């Protein structure tokens, strides 16, 4: 890295704290390209899957696109998920899924995606979709036998020396407040609370602020913070490695 400098504030509520060059951010949808897509290609490179494989090879209940008259049918491939040409909807109704399946429920999330409407015939259009990358997460975990967090850590983040990059598992406590259920990878090298390095994202209705718990609702509520569409936390220096 040729130049690294911090500007502005990393926090303005309940107190103001300045940004530092070591501040760690919720990478949100950048998680797709920073982790999920790369992990998929790592498995392809190792011969564990093929990008032209049908998704149903790894998720048997995953339905194909079928025309309204039932006369035309087309499978959805891993490549279609990666390139947002699968026809899957952009997002899913988090509150409805939570009511139906409970929280967290990665299996419920996949059941919904496997059977939800397909907006268009695969490979005929483009539509950015978080559901594509949540589906890729399930494929990665099925093929590797590891959680996305563990696979990315062992095969990507550690390999590149990204010491301050991680997924941060979370859940609601008994009072409904979001808390982390495991330490961040950088916790042992941080004096005091490892959350102190993280830039918070959003004030909650109870006055608390999300800090270390992914902001994306599907990733947080349904997938406990480890999700193919969002969930990576990282800093500028680590991102520069990628």
Annotate each language-model stretch with its function:
Residues 7, 66-242:
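Short, surface-exposed loop or secondary-structure junction motifs
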Residues 51-67, 158-160:
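Short, glycine/proline-biased beta-turn/loop segments that scaffold the active-site neighborhood
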Residues 1-27, 48, 65, 111-115:
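Short, conserved catalytic-motif segment at the N-terminal edge
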Residues 38-44, 59, 82-89:
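Generic hydrophobic/packing signal
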Residues 26-52, 133-141, 239-242:
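Active-site SXXK
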């Amino acid at each position: 890295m040729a130049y690294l400098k911090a500007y502005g504030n990393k926090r303005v509520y309940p107190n103001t704290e300045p940004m530092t060059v070591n501040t760690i951010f919720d990478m949100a949808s950048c998680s797709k390209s920073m982790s999920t897509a790369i992990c998929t290609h790592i498995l392809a490179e190792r011969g564990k899957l093929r990008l032209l494989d049908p998704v149903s090879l790894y998720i048997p209940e995953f339905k194909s696109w079928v025309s309204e008259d039932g006369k035309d049918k087309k499978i959805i491939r891993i490549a279609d998920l990666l390139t947002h040409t699968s026809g899957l909807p952009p997002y899913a109704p988090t509150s409805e899924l939570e009511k139906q399946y409970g929280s967290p429920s990665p299996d419920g999330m996949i059941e919904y995606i496997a059977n939800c409407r397909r907006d268009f015939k695969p490979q005929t259009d483009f539509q950015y979709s978080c559901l594509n990358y949540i589906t890729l997460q399930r494929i990665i975990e099925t093929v590797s036998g590891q959680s996305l967090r563990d696979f990315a850590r062992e095969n990507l983040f550690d390999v590149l020396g990204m010491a301050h990059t991680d997924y941060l598992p979370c859940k609601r406590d008994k009072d409904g407040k979001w808390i982390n259920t495991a330490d961040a990878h950088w916790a042992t090298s941080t004096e005091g609370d490892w959350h102190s390095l993280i830039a918070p994202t959003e004030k909650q209705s109870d006055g608390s602020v999300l800090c270390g718990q992914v902001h994306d609702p599907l990733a947080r509520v349904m997938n406990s913070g480890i999700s193919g569409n969002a969930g990576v936390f990282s800093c500028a220096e680590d991102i520069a490695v990628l």
